[in-house]
C-alpha cells in the first residue's frame, strides 16, 4: 500500500492510501494517530471534525485531549492539533470522552464529557473559542452538569427557531434546553422514558433479563433535523455496539424507533459513535472503527461514508468500508 501525503501551509494533510486494485482507500480519514467519537460541523465552506484521541497501546479509555481536523474536499484533511485537553478544565482530571462543537453568534461552543474531581463521576463541560480550531477555554470554570456516571456523550442542536438543546447519557438519555448564552441550562434536566416503541426497549431498570427486545439504546446520541423531522441517532445493543435511530416531529419527542443504520459488523471496535452532516450537496455519516494498524477497542479511528436518505426521509443501511468517500471539488495545494 502506498500512502501519499501533502503539506499545505506547513500542516500535514492526510491524502489517500492506494490499494492493490488502484482503488482509493480513504478510511480511516486520519492515519497518524487514533481519533474517536467524530462530531462533524460545517462553517464558512469548510467541514470540521472534532474527535477524541485514544492513547497508543491503551487498555482503557484513558483519554487526555480532543483534536480537530478539517477538509474542503472530503479526502484531504488538515490536522489542527489539540486545542482542548483535560488540563483546560481545572475541575477535571481524566477521560476526555465524546464531544461536539457548534457555532452561535460568531462563537464556537465545544461540549465535552470528562471525569470531574468535584463529584468523582462524569460531567458535562463546555469550552468556548473565537475560531473553529481554537484556542478554546473553559467557558464557565465549572461543570455545566455534574454528578453521575451516566453523564457522557453530549450532542447539541440549534433549531430553526433559535432554541438550543443538549442530549447526553449512558444508559439513560438526558436532555435540557440551553439558554441563549449557550453556557447555562434553561429549566430542569429531563430524562427520556425509553420504551419499545421509542427506542426498541424499556428504560434500563425495566428491562427483563433474557428478553430479546427490538433494540436497546446504549450511548452516543446525535441529534439533527432534516425537512421538518428530528433524528436521534445512537450507539445501541450494548457490547458490541451498532448504530440505530429514532425519529420525531419535535426536538423533545415523542420518539419512534426506526431501526438500525449501521448494523453490527467487523469494524474492529466494540464501540461505535456517529455524527451526520450535509456538505456540498452530499450527506455524510461519520463513525469510528478499530482498523488502523495497532488499533482495536481502545485504539479507534474516524471513518466516513456518503449516503442518501430514502425517499420517505428514513436512513438506508450504511456499512463500513475501507474505500470511504470520493473527493468533492478540487484542492489547490498552494
Regions found by a protein language model. Name each.
Residues 23-334:
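Carbohydrate-active catalytic/glycan-binding domains of CAZyme proteins
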Residues 1-26:
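Bacterial Sec-dependent N-terminal signal peptides
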Amino acid at each position: 500500500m502506498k500512502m501519499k501525503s501533502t503539506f499545505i501551509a506547513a500542516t500535514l494533510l492526510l491524502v489517500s492510501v492506494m490499494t492493490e486494485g488502484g482503488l482509493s482507500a480513504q478510511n480511516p480519514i486520519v492515519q497518524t494517530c487514533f481519533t474517536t467519537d467524530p462530531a462533524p460541523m460545517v462553517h464558512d465552506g469548510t467541514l470540521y471534525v472534532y474527535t477524541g484521541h485514544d492513547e497508543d497501546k491503551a487498555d482503557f479509555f484513558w483519554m487526555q485531549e480532543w483534536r480537530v481536523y478539517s477538509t474542503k474536499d472530503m479526502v484531504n484533511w488538515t490536522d489542527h492539533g489539540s486545542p482542548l485537553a483535560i488540563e483546560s478544565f481545572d475541575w477535571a482530571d481524566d477521560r476526555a470522552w465524546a464531544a461536539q462543537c457548534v457555532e452561535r453568534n460568531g462563537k464556537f461552543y465545544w461540549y465535552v464529557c470528562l471525569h470531574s474531581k468535584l463529584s468523582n463521576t462524569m460531567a458535562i463541560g463546555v469550552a468556548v473559542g473565537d475560531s473553529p480550531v481554537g484556542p478554546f477555554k473553559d467557558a464557565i470554570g465549572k461543570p455545566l452538569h455534574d454528578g453521575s456516571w451516566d453523564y457522557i456523550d453530549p450532542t447539541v442542536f440549534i433549531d430553526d427557531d433559535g432554541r438550543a438543546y443538549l442530549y447526553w447519557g449512558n444508559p439513560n438519555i438526558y436532555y435540557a434546553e440551553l439558554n441563549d448564552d449557550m453556557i447555562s441550562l434553561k429549566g430542569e434536566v429531563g430524562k427520556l422514558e425509553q420504551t419499545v416503541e421509542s427506542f426498541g426497549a424499556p428504560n434500563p431498570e425495566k428491562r427483563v433479563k433474557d428478553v430479546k427486545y427490538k433494540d436497546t439504546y446504549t450511548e452516543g446520541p446525535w441529534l439533527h433535523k432534516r425537512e421538518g423531522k428530528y433524528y436521534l441517532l445512537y450507539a445501541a445493543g450494548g457490547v458490541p455496539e451498532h448504530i440505530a435511530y429514532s425519529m420525531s416531529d419535535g426536538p423533545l419527542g415523542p420518539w419512534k424507533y426506526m431501526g438500525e443504520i449501521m448494523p453490527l459488523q467487523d469494524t474492529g471496535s466494540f464501540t461505535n459513535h456517529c455524527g451526520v452532516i450535509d456538505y456540498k450537496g452530499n450527506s455524510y455519516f461519520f463513525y469510528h472503527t478499530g482498523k488502523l494498524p495497532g488499533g482495536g477497542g481502545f485504539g479507534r479511528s474516524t471513518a466516513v461514508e456518503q449516503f442518501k436518505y430514502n425517499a420517505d426521509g428514513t436512513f438506508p443501511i450504511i456499512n463500513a468500508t475501507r474505500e470511504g468517500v470520493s473527493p468533492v471539488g478540487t484542492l489547490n495545494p498552494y
